[in-house]
Each structure stands twice: as structure tokens, then as C-alpha cells.
């Protein structure tokens, strides 16, 4: 406990030192602009169409659109360990959006994390990944967003605790952590792999959720795509080894990224938005490239579901977890966990059950999952949450039953683990 306090104090000291240095640098280097003329962008239709495709590949709408709000008008609240950050309006409204931004201003934000007024952005806007974007692609996205309908939606003020609310401190943070490229999590050299690396590491910024983060919120680039719990639902390990260990292979990943339901899993929570707003719109060639990068030029074979120890399996099948499954889950998922195609996910070999960390399974059990529509007219019916029906011990028992019987895991979920997630 004392060590943790010392670590936190050291972190604050580092931040404060960075703030002091940054303020000095900022006074000399940051040339901010306010006011200015409204930009009129008359871009060719082909460039706007290309920009739309790239904006979808970059998943801009997922963050810059609030639930039930206008697309790209901002307002989405993003929770972090440092406070709440609100996504901004990036429609061409001159007063609330980026209507006065030039293409150079837009590029500076994507590449350097600097706003038009010279203030640093927080890395909730993933310039840490977008830094690898080509200028041509940035200009195409700019041409697209400047054709959107201007929305007079005011931006909400970011709410961070001291000293993280001092934006100039981000200059010091950038000096420490901003790099020109993000390491690859797989091995390859083919044209498809190279394109997939750009789609995953730059446009799609997969590492912003799937890469572990350090004490000051920086991506731990020594562990790219190894998984991290940035929010309530964890982003799992999507390295080649991590994907293969849960039964994923190229064909099922292609289907999953294009449709949201494929092979051993279906998308929910934030990943559902990624599928619907972004990866479903990729061309077949880019879909294949993304999969090639995620698995590498020489993909590892998908691991078969390991057989459960007969004694452990017998105990699970005759225990209270099975009783609760039959009472609460079997009506939809079936007694044998086979689910219903395009309606209820199958549990046998399910990717979430095969995760070593039970977090996502427990969150789904406690919170439930709302109805989800997917491309190609597929949809999954709502799953109710059982937080009010299951005690911590019962939820742990049910999770252990599911993981042992259909996930190849050990019955090691404890009641305390459930309690921590309530």
C-alpha cells in the first residue's frame, strides 16, 4: 500500500515537472490561431468519397458522435482513470466545430496532437496512432468532414483532476511517449500484411484499446495488442497467439470483421460499434489485409478446445452452476450451449469463455447485453443481466460451469472477483 502511494506521488511529480518544462516550450513554439475565415472546401467528388471511406476505416464517428446525437457532432463521454473526456464536434460549423480549420490545421491535429488554437489534445483522440497517417489520407478525410452538415452543437468541457487538467502538460507527455510508428504485433512482409498494418495500427488505431497502458496512460509498446481493460469491458489479446488460442482463424476473422458474428464469437459493447461503423465498410481486399496483419503472413493454427478433466467436468455438470444455467440460460442458449444462428450466440467454444480472464463473461452476466443489429440482416436478441438474481457465489459458480464445459478453462472464478465488478 505504501509502495503504491509512493508510485502515485512519483507519477504526479513527473507530470508536474513536465508541465513546467512544457509551459516554457509552449510559449515559444506553439503558434495558436483563433477567429479566422470560415473555410470553403470545394473538393472533387472522388476525393470526398475516398475521405468518407478513410473516415469509416478510422472509425471517427464512433467517438465523435454521442448516443442519439448527430453524426460527428461530438458529445460522447469517454471515461478514463484521470477523469472524463468529451469528444468534440468535428462538423464544419464555424463556432462549435472545425469550420475555420484549414487542411494544415487538421493535419497538425492528427499528426502532432495540437489543436488549431495551439493547445495540445489529450490522447483520447488517437493522434498517437494517426501520426502514421499519410498527408494524402488526412487531406481526403478533411475534404469529407468539411462536406458534412454543420451542426451547432457546443462542445462539453473535459473534466480531469489536477494536474491532468493542465493541457500544456501534454507537451511533456508527448516528448516522453509520442512515437512515429506503433510496433507490429505479428510478423510479415507481404503487400497485404503491410496494408493491414496501416489499417490496424494507424487508421483503425486498434492498439488504443487492445494494447496495455502504463501509469500515465501511455501505450506499452513492448506489448502491442496484448489486451487491456480500458473500460468496463476488456479489449482482449488480439496478437496471433492470442487469437489462435481462442480458436480464431483467417476465415472466421474475415466474417467477424465484416458481419460482427463469425466463428467462435460475436461483437458486443464497444466492438459492436467498431464493426457497424467501421470494419463492415472495408473492401474485401482491405478486410483480407487486416486479417493478414492480425494473424501474420504465417498464421498459427487455431487451438482446438482442450478436453476438460473428467473429474472437474463431472463436478461442474452436477453442481449448482449447471442448475442455474438450466434455469436462467438454457431457454435461449440451449441445454448444450449451441445457441440459435444469427439470434443467440453459441457458447460451445465461445471466444469469451476461452479467455483466461473471466472479466468480460462476468460483465455480460451481470449487466446483460442489449439487442444488437449487425450487417446482412443479422441480429442478436437482448440478454438480460442477472446481477439482481445471482449472488456473488452463484455468479462465480455459473461462470465456472460455462468456462469448464465450453471454454476449456479451470473453475477458478471466485466470488470476490464477481463482487469487484458489481
Which residues are covered by each model-predicted region?
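N-terminal type II signal-anchor transmembrane helix
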Residues: 1-35
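Flexible coil segments in periplasmic/lumen-exposed cytochrome c-class electron-transfer proteins
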Residues: 24, 28-38, 65-84, 116-197, ...
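Asp/Glu-centered strand-loop micro-motifs enriched in Gly/Pro and often flanked by an aromatic residue
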Residues: 36-43, 93-95
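Short extracytoplasmic
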Residues: 42-77
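The feature marks the first
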Residues: 59-62, 80-88, 92-132, 136-137, ...
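Short cysteine-rich clusters marking metal-coordination/redox-active sites
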Residues: 60, 206, 329
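C-terminal structural cap/anchor segments
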Residues: 320-360
Amino acid at each position: 500500500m505504501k509502495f503504491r502511494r509512493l508510485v502515485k506521488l512519483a507519477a504526479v511529480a513527473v507530470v508536474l515537472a513536465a508541465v513546467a518544462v512544457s509551459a516554457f516550450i509552449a510559449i515559444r513554439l506553439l503558434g495558436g490561431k483563433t477567429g479566422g475565415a470560415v473555410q470553403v472546401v470545394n473538393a472533387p467528388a472522388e476525393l470526398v468519397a475516398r475521405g468518407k471511406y478513410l473516415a469509416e476505416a478510422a472509425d471517427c464517428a464512433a467517438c465523435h458522435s454521442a448516443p442519439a446525437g448527430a453524426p460527428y457532432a461530438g458529445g460522447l463521454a469517454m471515461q478514463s482513470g484521470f477523469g472524463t473526456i468529451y469528444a468534440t464536434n468535428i462538423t464544419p460549423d464555424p463556432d462549435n466545430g472545425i469550420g475555420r480549420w484549414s487542411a494544415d490545421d487538421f493535419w497538425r491535429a492528427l499528426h502532432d496532437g495540437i489543436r488549431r488554437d495551439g493547445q495540445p489534445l489529450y490522447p483520447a483522440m488517437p493522434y498517437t496512432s494517426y501520426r502514421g497517417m499519410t498527408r494524402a489520407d488526412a487531406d481526403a478525410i478533411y475534404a469529407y468532414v468539411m462536406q458534412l452538415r454543420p451542426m451547432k452543437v457546443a462542445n462539453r468541457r473535459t473534466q480531469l483532476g489536477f494536474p491532468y487538467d493542465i493541457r500544456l502538460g501534454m507537451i511533456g507527455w508527448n516528448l516522453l511517449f509520442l512515437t512515429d510508428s506503433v510496433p507490429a504485433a505479428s510478423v510479415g512482409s507481404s503487400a497485404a500484411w503491410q496494408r493491414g498494418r496501416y489499417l490496424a495500427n494507424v487508421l483503425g488505431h486498434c492498439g488504443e484499446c487492445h494494447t496495455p497502458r502504463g501509469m500515465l496512460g501511455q501505450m506499452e509498446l513492448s506489448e502491442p495488442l496484448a489486451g487491456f481493460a480500458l473500460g468496463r469491458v476488456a479489449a482482449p489479446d488480439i496478437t496471433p497467439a492470442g487469437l489462435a488460442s481462442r480458436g480464431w482463424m483467417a476465415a472466421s476473422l474475415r466474417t467477424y470483421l465484416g458481419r460482427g458474428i463469425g466463428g467462435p464469437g460475436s461483437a458486443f459493447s464497444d466492438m459492436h460499434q467498431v464493426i457497424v461503423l467501421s470494419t463492415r465498410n472495408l473492401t474485401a481486399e482491405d478486410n483480407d489485409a487486416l486479417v493478414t496483419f492480425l494473424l501474420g503472413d504465417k498464421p498459427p493454427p487455431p487451438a482446438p478446445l482442450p478436453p476438460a478433466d473428467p473429474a472437474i467436468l463431472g463436478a461442474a455438470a452436477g453442481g449448482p452452476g449447471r442448475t442455474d444455467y438450466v434455469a436462467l440460460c438454457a431457454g435461449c442458449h440451449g441445454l448444450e450451449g449451441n445457441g440459435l444462428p444469427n439470434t443467440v450466440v453459441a457458447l460451445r467454444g465461445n471466444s469469451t469463455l476461452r479467455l483466461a480472464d473471466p472479466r468480460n463473461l462476468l460483465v455480460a452476466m451481470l449487466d446483460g447485453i442489449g439487442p444488437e443489429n449487425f450487417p446482412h440482416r443479422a441480429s442478436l436478441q437482448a440478454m438480460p443481466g442477472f446481477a439482481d438474481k445471482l449472488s456473488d457465489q452463484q455468479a462465480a459458480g455459473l461462470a465456472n460451469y460455462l468456462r469448464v464445459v465450453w471454454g476449456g478453462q479451470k473453475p477458478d472464478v471466485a466470488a470476490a472477483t464477481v463482487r469487484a465488478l458489481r
